[in-house]
Design a protein with these regions (language model features):
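Walker A (P-loop) phosphate-binding loop of P-loop NTPases
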Residues: 1
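Motif I (Walker A/P-loop) of helicase-class P-loop NTPases
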Residues: 4-13, 119-124
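Post-Walker A helix-loop "phosphate-sensing" segment adjacent to the P-loop in P-loop NTPases
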Residues: 14-21, 157-159
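Short loop/turn elements that form and flank the Walker-type P-loop nucleotide-binding site
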Residues: 17-19, 44-45, 58-61, 99-104, ...
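Conserved nucleic-acid-binding Ia/Ib motif block in the N-terminal RecA-like helicase ATPase lobe
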Residues: 20-73, 151
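Conserved nucleotide-binding/hydrolysis micro-motifs of P-loop NTPases
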Residues: 29-31, 55-57, 69-72, 112-113, ...
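SF2 helicase catalytic motif II
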Residues: 68-70, 79-137
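Conserved interdomain linker/interface between the two RecA-like ATPase lobes of SF2 helicase motors
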Residues: 128, 135-137, 142-154, 159-198
């Protein structure tokens, strides 16, 4: 891997050692499953849960891994409960962390999905809705103009934000080009290569 998950792992270890909870969000179920398995193997002394819509396992865990949409839906259900003075018995929540007292950090893996035309609004509203005391950790290897993105987070959430970037690559990048040629030019191209080899 590229090592971009390391800040999230530090946060998980730190906050769990303080008796707090962490939510780790991903854009797709497959990545949630992968992160759940990877983190559970790497940190067997920490309790992990997963919520993807298809799977609901250990929702009381110290670290919950889920899609961003599940976090969004639960946050807004909790807001509706508070606003309408409803009891939790009337609404089924995917998880029931006390956001104010227990939750310390939310990791947004592949945070560049905030630029997705269809799903970006969910990511934006989730970030804007999180209480100020909850640390936001955004991970991306491909986000465009990260400085502007950090400034946006500061503006909408009143949080001091730091950008940690690393231009070096842990995994070397090799460029390949795959070309197709119409059959009529293939014979000519093949003959030219054959002549150069001989």
């Amino acid at each position: 891997g590229s090592g971009k998950t390391l800040p999230a792992e530090f946060a998980i270890k730190y906050f769990v050692s303080q008796g707090k909870k962490v939510i780790y969000t991903t854009p797709i179920k497959a990545l949630s499953n992968e992160k759940f398995n990877d983190l559970q193997q790497k940190y067997p002394d920490i309790s992990f849960g997963i919520l993807t819509g298809d799977i609901k396992y250990n929702p009381e865990a110290d670290v919950l891994i889920m899609t961003t949409e599940i976090l969004y839906n639960t946050l807004f259900q909790k807001i509706m409960i508070e606003k309408n003075n409803e009891t939790k018995q009337n609404i089924t929540l995917d998880f029931d962390i006390d956001i104010q007292r227990e939750l310390s950090a939310v990791v947004f893996d592949e945070i560049h999905y905030i630029n997705d035309a269809d799903r970006g609004r969910i990511w934006e509203e989730t970030i804007m809705t999180l209480p100020k005391h909850v640390q936001i950790i955004g991970l991306s290897a491909t986000i465009d103009q990260p400085e502007h993105f950090c400034q946006w987070i500061e503006n909408v959430s009143s949080r001091e934000t730091w950008l940690c970037s690393n231009k070096s690559r842990v995994v070397p990048l090799t460029h390949f080009a795959f070309l197709t040629y119409p059959e009529s030019s293939y014979d000519k191209f093949s003959l030219e290569i054959k002549n150069k080899i001989e």
